[in-house]
Regions:
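Short amphipathic alpha-helical "interface-anchor" segments enriched in bulky aromatics
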Residues: 40, 88, 325-362, 366-377
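Basic, amphipathic alpha-helical segments enriched in Lys/Arg and hydrophobic/aromatic residues
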Residues: 71, 350-426
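Structural preference for beta-strand elements that scaffold enzyme active sites
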Residues: 146-150, 222-224, 246-248
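An anionic, glycine-rich sequence signature occurring as long contiguous blocks
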Residues: 3-23, 246-348, 404, 430-437
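Short, surface-exposed basic-aromatic patches at helix termini and helix-loop junctions that form
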Residues: 237-246
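Acidic/histidine-rich, metal-coordinating catalytic segments
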Residues: 152, 220-231
Length: 437
């Protein structure tokens, strides 16, 4: 039976004019801002460098879509909000995307991209992480005095029978438990893990690898490791002490800690009774868990509010005022939570629906690489602007999703962007900044 697809649509009259619509406009794209993503990529040389080092098991005589094209097609698609491989069966003919990845013919289909993702392995994951660190080092003109490495894990909900799927009691769902490492807003690690392990599993090894490479580049640099109480494990603490790495890591409260902190807890309670306002009192105690090799300094934050007592503890090997260390250094790790939220919410890091383990690790890395492009666009192109602190989804909506008519011939490709775009001046500023240097 013949199925007819409607190509023209009628809408209610406006100002005595008939309104008609149809998908017959030719080369028109909603992704005119792809040029900014491409420019950020060229600035970093991200995909060009990765493509030179990533393995490609395909027969070179039969390759239609080069590895760098596949990488760009997937990353640029994620930046523009296309998380599903099926989207590329339509996008492969989009002139805007073709231009961004520097191809004139149809791009790879969803099945080609799927085969590519399922061919990923441990070596590919290692090379991407290595590329992140090398790029991070290369982007520093001068050696930094201090680097703060933030560790955190998050849940990646699962709805199928993926390899490594386990039920997690805390999150109350089947999920993966990826580990992220950030230095400021720069992503240095995105490591997929099953959820049937300790939240700190592999953290020590990853920190050791990062510290070793960073100190090769900058021997005098001071390195600080931050994490919540899930990462307070003797192996990590002992390694940091032995290698002159500073740390501020949350410590779960217990009866011994509460007993040691009792003077400050009572002081906060007394002050609250007198003022009826939230009180915080800070102190430092020496504490050693049974599994630790020695006692360590622990910051006590004795807080009392209208809801009662709320003591918190942070183990440190730094000197300084307890309140300053807690407020100015430890609490600053909360900004990392926003960066982690951007991974699934803005760049679809939770799209780990492949059956194979390494294919899902590869998807997590692709989202991380897309974040690297968006972070560069924000850090370089949007510094000091109204979008300087905007999340990836906001940047996409206001600067990347711009309607454009495309005219392509043998000499040039013209993007005729929407004249009514409200961010034209900002767009021009970003172009100039990404083109400089």
């Amino acid at each position: 039976m013949t199925v007819c697809t409607q190509t023209s649509f009628d809408f209610p009259v406006a100002n005595r004019r008939r309104i008609q619509a149809g998908f017959t406009g030719g080369d028109v794209s909603s992704d005119g801002g792809l040029l900014l993503v491409r420019q950020a990529d060229r600035k970093l040389q991200l995909t060009a460098t990765l493509a030179k080092h990533l393995p490609d098991a395909r027969d070179p005589t039969k390759v239609i879509h080069p590895l760098v094209t596949l990488l760009r097609q997937r990353l640029y698609g994620l930046c523009q909000g296309y998380e599903d491989l099926n989207d590329h069966d339509r996008l492969r003919t989009d002139v805007a995307l073709q231009t961004a990845v520097e191809q004139d013919e149809e791009l790879a289909s969803a099945s080609t991209l799927c085969r590519w993702e399922n061919g990923a392995d441990r070596q590919a994951a290692w090379l991407v992480h290595q590329g992140w660190v090398e790029q991070f080092i290369a982007r520093h003109v001068t050696a930094p005095a201090e680097l703060v490495l933030d560790l955190d894990a998050t849940d990646d909900p699962l709805h199928g029978k993926q390899q490594g799927a386990f039920f997690h009691g805390y999150y109350r769902q089947y999920c993966f438990l990826p580990l992220y490492v950030f230095c400021g807003e720069r992503l240095l690690g995105a490591y997929l893990r099953p959820s049937n392990i300790d939240v700190a599993r592999h953290a020590w090894a990853i920190v050791a690898l990062l510290v070793k490479r960073l100190r090769q580049a900058w021997p005098p640099v001071k390195i600080v490791v931050r994490g919540d109480s899930g990462f307070c494990r003797w192996r990590l603490l002992r390694w940091c002490d032995r290698h002159a790495v500073n740390y501020l890591i949350g410590l779960a409260k217990n009866e011994r800690l509460l007993a040691l902190a009792q003077p400050w807890i009572e002081q906060a309670a007394t002050q609250y009774e007198q003022t009826q306002q939230k009180q915080r009192v800070f102190g430092v105690v020496e504490y050693a868990a049974h599994t630790w090799d020695r006692a360590r300094r622990v910051i006590v934050k004795a807080e009392h509010t209208d809801k009662g007592r709320n003591p918190r503890f942070v183990v440190i090997n730094l000197s300084g005022d307890a309140q300053s260390l807690y407020d100015e250094l430890y609490c600053a790790r909360g900004e990392m939570e926003n960066r982690i939220k951007e991974q699934p919410l803005g760049l679809f890091a939770d799209r780990t629906s492949c059956h194979g383990w390494w294919a899902n690790q590869w998807r997590l890395l692709l989202s991380g690489l897309a974040y690297t492009l968006m972070e560069a666009l924000r850090r370089i192109g949007l510094a000091g602007s109204e979008l300087a602190r905007a999340q990836c989804g906001t940047i996409r909506l206001k600067l990347l999703k711009i309607g454009a008519v495309l005219v392509r011939n043998t000499r040039r490709v013209r993007f005729l962007l929407a004249a009514s775009c409200p961010y034209q001046e900002l767009f021009a500023t970003v172009v100039a900044r990404l083109a400089s240097g």
